[in-house]
C-alpha cells in the first residue's frame, strides 16, 4: 500500500501516475482539507475504471489510515507563488513536514518516505529528523525532475529525444543546483562534447530557471513533471528495481559531506536509497558542488532549533 500525503496538484498527479504505471493496487490519499482527498480518490477511481486499471484509491483526513503503507509520499506544504523562492518557504513548511514526519513514524514505522516539499533538501533533513528513520529511508525528490529538464533542453538543442540522454544534476534543488554536462551522456558521449559552450550554458540556465518559469507563466508551480518523476521513484522502491536515479539524501561522508541532504546519484530499491554513487568531478566541478552544499548548509542553520 502507498500513502500520498497532500492532495493538491502534485499529490493528485502523483496518485494518478502511480495508478497508470501500476506501482500498487491500493493507494491512500490523505489531506487536512475535508472532502479534498475523498473527491480526488473518487475521481481517480473513475479514471481507473475507464482505463481498466487494477487500482483502488481511498481518501482520508486521518493519518491513521496510512497504517500498513510500506511507502509514504509527502507532497504536502505551501507551494511557491510567482516571485517566491523555494527558500522563502522554509519555516512554514518545516512545521508542516515535521508534524507529518511524526505521524509517519507513528503509523507507518517501516515505510520508505519520498518527499517533494520545498525547499527540498532542507525539508528532507527535517523529515529525517522528525521520523527518526535511517537516512536510506528518507529520500527527497529532486534530481529526477532537474535531470529530466536538463535532458529536455539539451535534447532540443541536439535535435534528439531526451530519452537518449542520461543527465546528471548535483547539489541543491534550488538556485544553486549544479547540472554536470561532462557527466551527462548520449550513448557514452558527454554533452560537453556534443554542444557548444554557449549551448551548454543556455541549457543549464533553462534547467535552473524552469520551475520559476512555469510558476511565472501559469501562476502556480509544476505538477505534471514532479508527479511523473515521483511515480518513477516509487516504482523503483516498490519493485526493488535497484535503479540509479538522482535524489536528495543525507550524506554520510560521500563527496566529503556528512549530515547534509544533497542531490546525488543513488540506487533506489526496497530499502530506499540503498547506495550513494560518487561521481568523479573535476576541480572546478568540485568547487561548484561545494558551493551548492554550502547553500544547503546555510538553510539548515537557519531552521528553528526544534527542527534540527
UniProtKB/Swiss-Prot annotation:
Disulfide bonds: none annotated. It catalyses: (S)-malate + NAD(+) = oxaloacetate + NADH + H(+). It is an enzyme of class 1 (oxidoreductase). One of its GO terms (molecular function) is L-malate dehydrogenase (NAD+) activity. NAD(+) binds at residues 6-11, 31, 93, 116-118. Its EC number is 1.1.1.37. One of its GO terms (biological process) is tricarboxylic acid cycle. The keyword NAD applies. InterPro entries: L-lactate/malate_DH, Lactate/malate_DH_C, Lactate/malate_DH_N, Lactate_DH/Glyco_Ohase_4_C, Malate_DH_type3, NAD(P)-bd_dom_sf. The active site is at 173 (proton acceptor). Substrate binds at residues 80, 86, 118, 149. Keywords: NAD, Oxidoreductase, Tricarboxylic acid cycle. Belongs to the LDH/MDH superfamily. Catalyzes the reversible oxidation of malate to oxaloacetate. This is Malate dehydrogenase.
Amino acid at each position: 500500500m502507498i500513502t500520498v500525503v497532500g492532495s493538491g496538484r502534485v499529490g493528485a498527479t502523483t496518485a494518478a501516475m502511480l495508478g497508470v504505471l501500476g506501482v500498487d493496487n491500493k493507494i491512500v490519499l490523505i489531506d487536512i482539507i475535508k472532502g479534498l482527498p475523498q473527491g480526488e480518490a473518487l475521481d481517480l477511481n473513475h479514471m481507473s475504471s475507464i482505463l481498466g486499471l487494477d487500482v483502488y484509491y481511498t481518501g482520508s483526513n486521518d493519518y491513521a489510515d496510512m497504517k500498513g503503507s510500506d511507502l509514504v509520499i509527502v507532497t504536502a506544504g505551501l507551494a511557491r507563488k510567482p516571485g517566491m523562492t523555494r527558500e522563502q518557504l522554509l519555516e512554514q513548511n518545516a512545521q508542516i513536514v515535521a508534524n507529518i514526519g511524526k505521524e509517519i513514524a507513528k503509523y507507518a514505522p517501516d515505510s520508505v518516505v519520498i518527499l517533494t516539499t520545498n525547499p527540498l533538501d532542507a525539508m528532507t533533513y527535517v523529515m529525517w529528523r522528525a521520523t527518526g528513520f535511517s537516512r536510506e529511508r528518507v529520500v527527497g525528490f529532486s534530481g529526477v525532475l532537474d535531470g529530466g529538464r536538463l535532458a529536455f533542453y539539451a535534447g532540443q538543442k541536439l535535435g534528439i529525444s531526451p530519452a537518449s540522454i542520461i543527465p546528471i544534476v548535483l547539489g541543491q534543488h534550488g538556485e544553486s543546483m549544479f547540472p554536470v554536462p561532462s557527466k551527462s551522456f548520449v550513448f557514452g558521449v558527454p554533452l560537453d562534447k556534443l554542444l557548444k559552450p554557449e549551448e551548454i550554458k543556455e541549457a543549464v540556465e533553462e534547467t535552473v530557471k524552469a520551475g520559476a518559469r512555469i510558476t511565472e507563466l501559469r501562476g502556480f508551480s509544476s505538477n505534471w513533471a514532479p508527479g511523473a518523476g515521483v511515480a518513477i521513484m516509487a516504482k523503483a522502491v516498490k519493485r526493488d528495481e535497484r535503479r540509479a536515479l538522482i535524489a536528495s539524501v543525507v550524506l554520510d561522508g560521500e563527496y566529503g559531506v556528512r549530515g547534509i541532504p544533497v542531490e546525488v546519484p543513488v540506487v533506489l530499491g526496497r530499502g530506499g536509497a540503498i547506495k550513494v554513487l560518487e561521481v568523479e568531478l573535476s576541480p572546478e566541478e568540485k568547487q561548484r558542488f561545494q558551493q551548492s552544499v554550502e547553500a544547503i548548509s546555510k538553510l539548515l542553520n537557519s531552521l528553528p532549533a526544534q527542527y534540527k
